[in-house]
Amino acid sequence: MRRLASALVFASILLGMKTVHAACVGRPTDAAGFASYDYADAAEVKSFAGTKVRVHYATTGQPAPTLTSTRADGVPDTVAFAADTGDGALSKYEAMGYNAVPSDAACASNGGDGLIDIYLVHFTAADGSTHAECDAGKCSSFALVESTFKGKGYANAEEGFKTVVTHELFHAVQNTYKPADAPFWAEGTAQWAMKKVHPELQDFERQMPAFFADPTRSLDAPPGGVTSGFLYGSSVWPLFLSLRQGDDFIRTVFEGEVDGADPLTSIDKALKAKSTSLADEYPLFAAWNVGTGKLKSSGGYPDAAKYPGQATMSLKDGASDITSGLGYFAYKGTLTAEQGITLETDASRNAGVVVPIVDDVLELDQAKKLPANANGSVLVVVSGITTKKSDAKFTIHVGDPIVETPAPGKDAGTPPVTSTPAPTAPAPDDGGCQASGGPTSSSALSAGVVALGLLFRRRRRS
């Protein structure tokens, strides 16, 4: 859903996150309307059918779109544009291998046929929402979309329709796999899909600042508020995954959610099928995010310079902090000689990478997992790697060089595995701000591993 305004709509969505909507919930064209949206003050309500969608609109009153038409059939240009946009988006999603959105013909209130319905309405502060109608595990959907986009921050109505219709219809696609998915994944992937269909649109970038400004917040714990920019800015996570693993990877995650798995569990399973994991990838994702804005980078996001960038702290021996969930911290510094960088922490909760900075460019394709040796200017990122929200303390140690496992040729951006010890079993997590169980010192264990001559082979990505 896009930035919702109605408290009734929000309540409906919250309910939908716990139980699947009953089939045939009613529409704005019904006498009773839908969640405060109706055409009661319209002299006439018309509709225009495309090949996959039907757009409903009022000819008078507050919900009416701009009615100017250059068409022989008299259909308003913006209405026809909305229909063409919807047809194009659904065709693109099907071409990408996603499920087709099922017909709603079985519902008495179905817009007149089995096409996917888009209702043009007036939002006070929002610009769109999508609603699933599910029966026996099969979900169709309909969408509410702003009718004029006046005062909504878009250059014109066409930009608004391309942005919102394309975003909302990916929610309809999502509903064929798992209705009411985790908001960060639902909104993030809808933004990602919108950008895949219309790469020229800038809404993807406009929504990033709130996410980039809050790196210590866990990805799956957005701040309160139905219009949270953090949710939309989290679109960089599916972007990262698609750049690392291919566009089809996102669909694979949705397919893994069909039986009820949460998105992060499905992501981890899909990554492990490619010989990596959430614990391997998330610290690198954090490093990619730091390598944006004014900090030049290579091997990361193609449009990194357009993204907001993130603040860093000074790297020093003994730097310490606490993660919660998938939050992360970034440190920059300069080493005057080769030194070993190790991480003292519960290895089941936190992990880190070190990335060289060469000629003021962050070389993300040279990232190495901690512990590792480094020299010169570097970025060190420490990230949570689980969804546990109790405190997970870490301390960075910068000291004498360590013995590393030689890393064979690697894929771009893949951190080579150094002589990292197997983690000890974590103590039970009591959820307190100082969870029981002391940290595991990766530096001390690493020395033990070297003494035993145990060298771990680098995990290769497929």
Regions found by a protein language model. Give the residues of each.
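Positively charged n-region of N-terminal signal peptides that target proteins for export
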Residues: 1-4, 458-462
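Beta/coil-rich, acidic/histidine-enriched accessory regions frequently appended to metallopeptidases
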Residues: 259-425
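Sec/Tat signal peptide C-region and signal peptidase I cleavage site
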Residues: 17-22
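Acidic/His/Gly-enriched intrinsically disordered linker/tail segments
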Residues: 134-136, 159, 163, 178-244, ...
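Juxtacatalytic substrate-recognition/specificity segment
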Residues: 51-182, 189, 199-203
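Extracellular Ser/Thr-rich, low-complexity/disordered mucin-like segments
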Residues: 421-443
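A cross-kingdom C-terminal cell-surface attachment/processing module
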Residues: 442-460
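Bacterial N-terminal signal peptides
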Residues: 7-16, 449-453
